[in-house]
């Protein structure tokens, strides 16, 4: 054994060939934490000092290669002064460069996944051989940063600037055949042949059949582009990527600028350019928010996994109520491998549900994400029925009938008599109390809420609602089923609107106040879209449905009359009474035409102004900043109340619920991280500034206490 650590070993294989193996003890995956980096330094030095070494194979002792840097450790570094951060990055990069500069040839044998620093380690090797089932990529832009271990330097010099820009700016994982096509790897083999293939490559390099020094040389030199080629490649790419990423996500464009700045330098000087740009990005609020989201997502996954121990396995599911929603749920279950019964009382609803599932599956086939055989398999896993005949073997039933408590109670009571005693019943409701619905059941302990967001196939969140009598097994089984469907479940306690809608309606309340104050709804939409929302509140209300919003507002007003009840008529009342229901009937705040792809296209409609005129009570001067605060303060305060009331257990879950459920701007991190970014004391002062607008703008006593004590939601 040449070197032995807790994350890395270096041992002799044969004829002067050694294997540098990553195998982090006590972890299921390899990652670059401080321990691994320190051991890599020692391992490289040990190889360098051993004259018997003729070649090095880099491998992994786990099912994946290396998943990247351990962000939980490195995030603290991002708060260091910029100069210290640059120095730390350059020190880490010296390790990779020293490995790259070894006198002997090196081969990286990539199994599983090599992401971020994992791929950057491979790029420092002379040759890369990849398992056909492996994937590689540089996903750092998704965290608001860019590759910092030489990725912006080595990748463009290996595969060309155009390909490298595409890989780095998109941040996606790339399959083996795509990696081979662009030259990111030198060979692709079946997983079982990876070790033999790596040995063959290294032997050919040792024998001189392959010239490893010549292979290495382009990575050490400047980019092979003349001035005109550089200008065309980089300026075009910056414009295109800026358009794709938008102004709130600077990392992809900064990555291109860094590649451009370093293009005329050799490796070492280029790495200095990379480190300087990386340090600037790492200290931005966008990086802080996106890294916070990543850590929150990890916490969500841990919490969801904790339910696995007591969850029952769902082998057969059922959905009550077909149509678009039922068809979407059936599709999601079937495509992820759980067969599902789809029941309705009307044949036409069944057909609508089947058409929806078939359409969604067909789109996946068109995009190459599903084979026709797999589509047929998924369709066969959806069994339409007008009766309860096959419900005896069902493990979970998702009720998705009309949003009416009496109808839901009747349907739930009926199905309870048709399923086995330990079957879970879950209501897909957006606003109706789970405790209220449970009153109709003989076994309320087997009942929970399971709130899917529309469209089901696109929205990642599922709220699993725990009622007063819901058992932990019922909650755990529903969480496990949601995960199996490919969703991100968050467990919340019962209250009107649960988490997401309870928080969304105060946001709509702020919008209603703005319209009543004479502010143009088109202007409000533009301001909030610029703030980072995927669509403004008027457009969102049209998409949700004015009737749905009207009903939801009434439910919330009944549940929280102290702050959500407003006796004045609002814009939503006016549109609802005028039968302008949004996209569903072609007119809401906007009018809708069908575009070439058959999708609704928003257009201005002057006639809506006459409809809104009676609900405009004043003409108030309101700045863009005021518009943001009228909307965001009540949303943030209601999120705080949900946390204080125990509706949601952690700040991480609250923020992720809003990002996944209503499209809260990810680069702002969620409502509670947004408060942190302003400062809790400053946010309380902001709320006080708008306190005359009503109780929705009144900070809670606990929040005031946090402000007084200098506390944050995230530390």
From Swiss-Prot:
GO terms for biological process: fatty acid beta-oxidation. The keyword Oxidoreductase applies. Pathway: Lipid metabolism; fatty acid beta-oxidation. NAD(+) binds at residues 325, 344, 401-403, 408, 430, 454. It comes from the Bacteria. Residues 312-715 are annotated as: 3-hydroxyacyl-CoA dehydrogenase. Its EC number is 4.2.1.17, 5.1.2.3, 5.3.3.8, 1.1.1.35. It catalyses: a (3S)-3-hydroxyacyl-CoA + NAD(+) = a 3-oxoacyl-CoA + NADH + H(+); a (3S)-3-hydroxyacyl-CoA = a (2E)-enoyl-CoA + H2O; a 4-saturated-(3S)-3-hydroxyacyl-CoA = a (3E)-enoyl-CoA + H2O; (3S)-3-hydroxybutanoyl-CoA = (3R)-3-hydroxybutanoyl-CoA. Gene3D superfamilies: 1.10.1040.50, 2-enoyl-CoA Hydratase, Chain A, domain 1, NAD(P)-binding Rossmann-like Domain. The record marks 120, 140 as: Important for catalytic activity. Substrate binds at residues 297, 501, 660. GO terms for molecular function: 3-hydroxybutyryl-CoA epimerase activity; delta(3)-delta(2)-enoyl-CoA isomerase activity; enoyl-CoA hydratase activity; long-chain-3-hydroxyacyl-CoA dehydrogenase activity; NAD+ binding. Keywords: Fatty acid metabolism, Isomerase, Lipid degradation, Lipid metabolism, Lyase, Multifunctional enzyme, NAD, Oxidoreductase. One of its GO terms (cellular component) is fatty acid beta-oxidation multienzyme complex. The keyword Lyase applies. HAMAP family: FadB. This is Fatty acid oxidation complex subunit alpha.
């Amino acid at each position: 054994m040449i070197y032995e650590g807790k994350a890395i070993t270096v041992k002799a294989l044969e004829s002067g060939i050694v294997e540098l193996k990553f195998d982090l003890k006590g972890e299921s995956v390899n990652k670059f934490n401080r321990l691994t980096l320190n051991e890599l330094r020692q391992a490289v030095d040990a190889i360098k000092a051993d004259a018997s070494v003729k070649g090095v194979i880099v491998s992994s002792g786990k099912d994946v290669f290396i998943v990247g840097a351990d962000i939980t450790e490195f995030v603290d570094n991002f708060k260091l002064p910029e100069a210290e951060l640059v120095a730390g990055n350059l020190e880490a990069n010296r390790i990779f460069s020293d490995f790259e500069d070894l006198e002997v040839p090196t081969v990286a044998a990539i199994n599983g996944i090599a992401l971020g620093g994992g791929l950057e380690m491979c790029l420092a090797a002379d040759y890369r051989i990849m398992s056909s089932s492996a994937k590689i990529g540089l996903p750092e832009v998704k965290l608001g940063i860019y590759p910092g271990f030489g990725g912006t330097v080595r990748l463009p010099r290996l595969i060309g600037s155009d390909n490298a820009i595409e890989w780095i700016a998109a941040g996606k994982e790339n399959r083996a055949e795509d990696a081979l096509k662009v030259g990111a790897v030198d060979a692709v083999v079946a997983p079982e042949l990876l070790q033999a293939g790596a040995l063959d490559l290294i032997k050919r390099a040792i024998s001189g059949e392959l010239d490893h020094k010549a292979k290495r040389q382009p990575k050490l030199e400047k980019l092979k582009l003349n001035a005109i080629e550089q200008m065309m490649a980089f300026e075009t790419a910056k414009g295109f990527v800026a358009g794709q990423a938008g102004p709130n996500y600077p990392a992809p464009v900064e990555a291109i600028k860094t590649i451009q700045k370093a293009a005329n330098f050799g490796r070492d000087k280029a790495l200095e350019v990379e480190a300087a740009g990386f340090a600037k990005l790492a200290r931005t609020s966008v990086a802080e928010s996106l890294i916070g989201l990543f850590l929150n997502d990890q916490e969500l996954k841990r919490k969801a996994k904790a339910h696995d121990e007591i969850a029952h396995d769902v082998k057969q599911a059922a959905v009550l109520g077909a149509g678009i929603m039922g068809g979407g749920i059936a599709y999601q279950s079937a495509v992820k491998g759980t067969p599902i019964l789809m029941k309705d009382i009307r044949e036409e609803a069944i057909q609508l549900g089947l058409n929806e599932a078939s359409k969604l599956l067909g789109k996946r086939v068109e995009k190459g994400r599903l084979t026709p055989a797999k589509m047929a398999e998924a369709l066969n896993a959806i069994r339409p029925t007008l009766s309860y005949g096959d419900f005896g073997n069902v493990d979970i039933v998702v009720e998705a009938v009309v949003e009416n408590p009496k109808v839901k109670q009747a349907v739930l009571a009926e199905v309870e008599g048709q399923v086995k005693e330990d079957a879970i019943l879950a209501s897909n409701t957006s606003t109706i109390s789970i405790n209220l619905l449970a009153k109709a059941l003989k076994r309320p302990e087997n009942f929970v809420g399971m709130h899917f967001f529309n469209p089901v196939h696109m929205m990642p969140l599922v709220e699993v609602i725990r009622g007063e009598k819901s058992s932990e097994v019922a909650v755990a089984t529903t969480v496990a089923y949601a995960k199996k469907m490919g969703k991100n479940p968050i467990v919340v306690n019962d209250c009107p609107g649960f988490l997401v809608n309870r928080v969304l309606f105060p946001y709509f309340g702020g919008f209603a106040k703005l319209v009543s104050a004479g502010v143009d709804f088109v202007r409000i939409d533009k301001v909030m879209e610029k703030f980072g929302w995927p669509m403004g509140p008027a457009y969102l209300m049209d998409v949700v449905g004015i009737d749905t919003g009207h009903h939801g507002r009434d439910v919330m007003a009944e549940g929280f009359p102290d702050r959500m009840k407003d006796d004045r008529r609002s814009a939503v009342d006016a549109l609802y009474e005028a039968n302008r229901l949004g996209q569903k009937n072609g007119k809401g705040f906007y009018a809708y035409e069908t575009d070439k792809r058959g999708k609704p296209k928003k257009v201005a409609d002057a006639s809506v102004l006459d409809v809104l005129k009676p609900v405009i009570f004043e003409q108030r001067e309101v700045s863009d900043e005021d518009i943001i605060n009228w909307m965001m303060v009540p949303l943030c305060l209601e999120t705080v109340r949900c946390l204080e009331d125990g509706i949601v257990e952690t700040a991480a879950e609250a923020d992720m619920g809003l990002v996944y459920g209503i499209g809260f701007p990810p680069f702002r991190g969620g409502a509670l991280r947004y408060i942190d970014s302003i400062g809790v004391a400053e946010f309380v002062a902001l709320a006080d500034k708008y306190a005359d607008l009503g109780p929705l703008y009144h900070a809670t006593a606990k929040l005031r206490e946090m402000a007084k004590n200098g506390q944050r939601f995230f530390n």
